[in-house]
Regions:
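Sequence contexts marking disulfide-bonded cysteines in secreted/extracellular proteins
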Residues: 52-60, 294-296, 374-376
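Intrinsically disordered, low-complexity acidic/polar segments
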Residues: 95-96, 190, 276, 339, ...
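Non-catalytic C-terminal accessory/binding modules of secreted extracellular proteins
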Residues: 3, 57, 65, 208-223, ...
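Short, polar loop/linker segments at the starts of domains and inter-domain junctions
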Residues: 97-109, 277, 342-344, 363-366
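Extracellular hydrolytic enzyme modules, especially secreted metalloproteases
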Residues: 173, 178-180, 186-341
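N-terminal beta-strand/alpha-helix entry module and adjacent surface
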Residues: 21, 54, 234
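Secretory targeting and sorting signals
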Residues: 2-36
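Zn2+-dependent metallopeptidase catalytic core
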Residues: 34-35, 41-231, 240, 395-396, ...
């Protein structure tokens, strides 16, 4: 079993218009590479996909949760019917807070609805809770030694082994694609102090149950409640973030917080107002067809008319490859679908690097109005990048690589015409 590596986010304080927003933390994630029967995302380029070939930046071996295509094997599939096993657990020193089904209801059906909207109906997420009461662990929570940043060994292995022993008489683990462990929120510290929520994905060294390893398992602990009164609407969002790791997506925040991507992807910020995934991630997960992606790989001028990412159908993404491991993605973001906090719609431009580890900044959003302070004061939304999208008449320039991306105009239907020049 390879040494566990973890990605930790520091607290980030964000101002609210009416009240002080409390410090927020995101979850950690761990990937333990190994063989698995299924992989997520689009398949490798076929001959008929030749025009897209240069834009399929390659998955980089040895990189945790590489942004490359196709997604490495070992993760849960991200299209079609996905069965999610949910087990609500408590401990002798932390008995269940409320009923177990009330804990389940904190996340569902909201999580399933979030994936339905984000995937344009391509992911059918089916949450199941075959055990409707609290699943009591045989040891106190303190005995497992779980803290933020804890490796899989020995604490989580021991916890998973106890979960399997306790649940196996009533659960057929082989029937499920992923596992969510919904811990009673009074086990461990408040999320305002430190977030324990974590995902172990691609971990074929995990304990087996009913002939399968619990290789893609998310753990959710205390409630991500910032005191703004929005928990009932937004508190569930930690689970789509954690399940994003199960599908092979990396953490986009860094040790400095969400300053590289902001609120433009739930893998960057999962506190506060609802937000969606980047178009690159939707292509990676198989939620966009190849026909919805344009590839500006050749020298010269390329023009694309892009429809809002929130809308089903139509051209969604233009990509400008810089190397076999990096390039610029171009998409249209509006306040619709899962994107609740968009205060300045427009064309979002960001750099994707497949040779950068999760939590080290594999994606960087280009800010059209640097040091502006942004256009939002919503709690737990990275303000500076909230006005990052480019508007008609504005141009992004990368002189070192000879790239100019200009937003030409927006039509009455909200489609944006984008011109990309390569020299």
């Amino acid at each position: 079993m390879q040494q566990t590596r973890r990605r930790i986010r520091r607290p980030v304080a964000l101002a609210a218009a009416a009240a002080l927003a409390l410090a927020a933390l995101a979850s950690a994630s761990t990937t333990l590479p190994g063989p698995a029967p299924a992989s997520a995302g689009p398949v490798a380029a076929a001959p008929t996909d030749a025009p897209l070939g240069p834009c399929r930046i390659a998955t980089t071996m040895g990189v945790q949760m590489s942004e490359g295509l196709p997604t490495a094997p070992g993760y849960a599939r991200s299209t079609g019917r996905v069965r999610a096993l949910n087990l609500m657990i408590d401990f002798p020193d932390a008995p269940g807070d409320g009923t177990a089904l009330a804990r389940f209801d904190e996340f569902f059906p909201k999580t399933a609805d979030w994936f339905r909207v984000s995937s344009y109906g391509r992911l059918h997420y089916h949450p199941e809770a075959p055990i409707t009461g609290w699943l009591r662990m045989p040891k106190p929570f303190s005995a497992y030694g779980i803290e933020r940043g804890s490796p899989y060994e020995p604490g989580y292995r021991g916890l998973v082994e106890d979960i399997v022993k306790t649940a196996d008489p009533k659960v057929d683990f082989s029937s499920y694609d992923l596992v969510n462990i919904l811990v009673t929120p009074n086990a461990g510290p408040s999320a305002l102090d430190t977030v324990l929520s974590v995902t172990f994905s691609g971990n074929d060294d995990a304990p087996y149950a009913d002939g399968v390893p619990l290789s893609n398992t998310s753990f959710v602990y205390s409630r991500q409640d910032d005191g703004s009164g929005s928990y009932a609407d937004t508190g569930y969002r930690v689970l789509p973030h954690e399940n994003g790791h199960v599908f092979g997506l990396p953490d986009l925040y860094t040790v400095d917080g969400g300053g590289t991507v902001g609120h433009w992807d739930i893998m960057s910020e999962d506190w506060g107002a609802n937000n969606d995934l980047l178009g690159w991630h939707k292509w990676k997960l198989g939620w966009l067809d190849n026909e919805q992606v344009g590839c500006a790989s050749r020298t010269g001028t390329h023009e694309y008319t892009l429809t809002p990412l929130a809308d089903a159908g139509g051209p969604k993404l233009a990509f400008v490859p810089l190397s076999e491991q990096s390039g610029y993605a171009v998409e249209v973001r509006t306040r619709d679908g899962n994107d609740e906090a968009v205060c300045e719609p427009g064309v979002l431009i960001y750099r994707v690097e497949s040779d950068v580890d999760t939590g080290h900044g594999p994606v960087t959003v280009a800010d059209s109005d640097k040091d502006s302070g942004g256009c939002t004061r919503r709690p737990n939304v990275h303000a500076e990048l909230s006005d990052a999208p480019y508007r008609p008449g504005e141009t992004f320039t990368d002189r070192a690589n000879g790239i100019r991306i200009t937003v030409m105009d927006e039509d009455a239907d909200g489609r944006y015409r984008v011109r990309i020049r390569r020299t």
